[in-house]
């Protein structure tokens, strides 16, 4: 019988096994079962770790990460079970344990909202409380970039830019459960990632004052796929077309980075209920490719 136990910290071997499970599930499902932040948390002790071990296989076969509540987000769980060990009730048992540990307001992500996740949600009496759209478009036939008078574009020059990046990010995303409330450590962690490229972090400055107005952080996932990772604009600078300028600047950069691909593609994530942003991205040629759903217990 599979054992399921909480850990405050993971061993190196457990971390390696979990990364392997995530990779296997991604290949099997066509969508990553957990977000990048979960992988960053594996060696840390900021979150809780629920590990499922199959005694016959002598191996980790499932993992749930439980992030504590923050000022902008409730407790959030993310879950993966190895494809070879599914349909045994492990996923449902882990989801039930994670939500119980997280408390009344806890939520659990279903990346791609696949049928298996929907079935588990029905079994546990959960309902969708939030949806995140993944949108994509080809990196071909891009509109030209237009830069307004008085705006200067540059790329990230190093940690000296971080205070202004944090100011813009935390004002633009004060409402956002994951993106809001960043600290220096959040930028430093991402700067240490293998994918980080300072030439792909674009910044728009006001020529007169020198103040940062907005930024677009791009990400390359592989030879065929790039991402609009974050676009943030100072709320005080809204209405100047900066979002479109920064987005298109990043798209042209990604198109150049992926120029050897026969089908270069860019993706982004946007809240399903952010109608204005969805409309803007549709105008730029993006279409919905998948939906991530956050589930929570139905209130009595």
From Swiss-Prot:
> What protein am I looking at?
Mycothiol acetyltransferase
The beginning of the lineage is: Bacteria, Bacillati, Actinomycetota, Actinomycetes, Mycobacteriales
UniProt binding sites for 1D-myo-inositol 2-(L-cysteinylamino)-2-deoxy-alpha-D-glucopyranoside: 36, 178, 219, 227, 269
Q: Which residues bind acetyl-CoA 1 per the record?
A: 79-81
Catalytic reactions of this protein: 1D-myo-inositol 2-(L-cysteinylamino)-2-deoxy-alpha-D-glucopyranoside + acetyl-CoA = mycothiol + CoA + H(+)
Could you tell me which PANTHER family the record lists for this protein? L-AMINO ACID N-ACETYLTRANSFERASE, MYCOTHIOL ACETYLTRANSFERASE
Q: Which Gene3D superfamilies match?
A: 3.40.630.30
The record's family statement is: Belongs to the acetyltransferase family. MshD subfamily.
Can you tell which superkingdom this protein's organism belongs to? Bacteria
Q: Which residues bind acetyl-CoA 2?
A: 231-233, 274-279
Q: Which part of the chain is the N-acetyltransferase domain?
A: 4-140, 151-300
Q: Please list the GO biological process terms of this entry.
A: mycothiol biosynthetic process
What are the protein's GO molecular function terms?
Answer: mycothiol synthase activity; protein-N-terminal-alanine acetyltransferase activity
Species of provenance: Mycobacterium sp. (strain KMS)
Q: What class of enzyme is it?
A: transferase
- What gene is it encoded by? mshD
Give the protein's function. Answer: Catalyzes the transfer of acetyl from acetyl-CoA to desacetylmycothiol (Cys-GlcN-Ins) to form mycothiol.
Might you give the EC number(s) for this enzyme?
2.3.1.189
List keywords of the entry alphabetically: Acyltransferase, Repeat, Transferase
Give the multimer and partner information: Monomer.
